[in-house]
Amino acid sequence: MNKSQAGILPNGWHKTFYTLWLGCFITGLGYSMTMPFISLFMAELGHYNKLQLNLYSGLAFAMTFIAQAIISPYWGNLADRKGRKLMCMRAAGVMSLTIFITGLAQSALFIICMRFLQGLFSGYINNATALMAGETPHQRSGWVMSQMMTAGTAGSLVGPLIGGALSSAFGYRIPFFITGGLMFLTFLGTWLLVKEDFTTVSRENMKPMGQILQDLPNVKLIIIMFVTTMIVQSSTMSIDPIVSLYVKSLMPHSNNIALIAGIVAATPGLGTMLSASHIGHLMDRVGAEKVLRWGLLIATILFIPMTFIPNAWSLAFWRFLLGIISAGLLPAAQTILTLNVPPEAFGRVFSYNQSFQAVGAVLGSLLGSTISGMFTYEWVFAATGITLLINYLIMQFSSQSRNA
């Protein structure tokens, strides 16, 4: 794509963008149809106490991201040599199998193992984002990055509602079977409809990552974006594994725990979907770094009232507001990476970013599960707010040092 043609989109661009957007939507949909209820699914497979159930739930979340953290650099290297479309197909195809098979689980251990296997081959959204980063004029990077995030979050908005309704009506296995089928359709759509302007590069002709980092004008900023991605993802995953259990503790006598938990899990996605386009345009106007700093500060403040919520509907309200702010966090970090890294290194840089995101997910899910198991659920929100505050301070001091 000619980067100077900021307002002109070449033939075929729309089809690729919409196909990848839909693929990211289905990926987010499938994840949120199943994972918010994984602890309730596990509870039906054995007799576990609170600490065991919280720990197994946290491990089920964490195993996928442990695998991602280990394998992502390999896939990123392959993406820069073979193209991102192939990586999207690999992710969608294998995920369709692993998610479907998870629905056949007879024990919590089996679920944990399948989640690890899924993590080794996942990464559809990150590779789709990297593909679009290489096909988008820089003047529109903020909007496109926010739209790619909107796809996943829109899916995460609808997913818990569908998953909660299906789980209540037919049991916790059915959402896994449906998600597996949808991911197979995503594989077919990516294979047949996505066009990538990419020339295969041999291993010998590929520029070493060390040399690319040496040539970057601001390596420190890239590293800070990796750390920011890790902390932001940690703040999300510290809450997600325990949402359904927390809702159950707030409404112990309700007969619709799965449905209400689905609504609570969906509210951040609604907030993000409603605000992503506006925040994306804001990033293109005032700069992604400024949006990221303010987003971290406001997110920190929002975790204060979440520490003292009286009921599930209050939790849903504050998570909705957090979702609005979240539209300016990870997309801003991805936009900063896009604008400061050469296109030939997108695959590897985005894969390293995915590794940090995976590490954050592991730390967050284990932190949330451990704290909630040893203390109370409210302490999870307090700890999460503190980590976001630390991230904000890192960004603030970094900006001041670069402007000094």
What is the meaning of each model-derived region?
Residues 2-14, 195-225:
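Juxtamembrane intracellular "pre-TM" segments in multi-pass secondary transporters
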Residues 12-40, 44, 219-238, 320:
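Pair of pore-lining "gating" transmembrane helices in MFS-fold secondary transporters
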Residues 37-54, 242-259:
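Short amphipathic helix-loop junctions that connect adjacent transmembrane helices
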Residues 58-75, 266-278:
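Central cavity-lining transmembrane alpha-helices of secondary-active solute carriers
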Residues 69-106, 283-289:
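Conserved MFS/SLC helix-loop-helix module at the cytosolic interface between two early adjacent transmembrane helices
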Residues 86-101, 180, 290-305, 385:
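Structural signature of the two symmetry-related core transmembrane helices
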Residues 98, 109-117, 302, 313-321:
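Paired small-residue
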Residues 114-152, 335-336:
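Cytoplasmic helix-loop-helix junction between adjacent transmembrane helices
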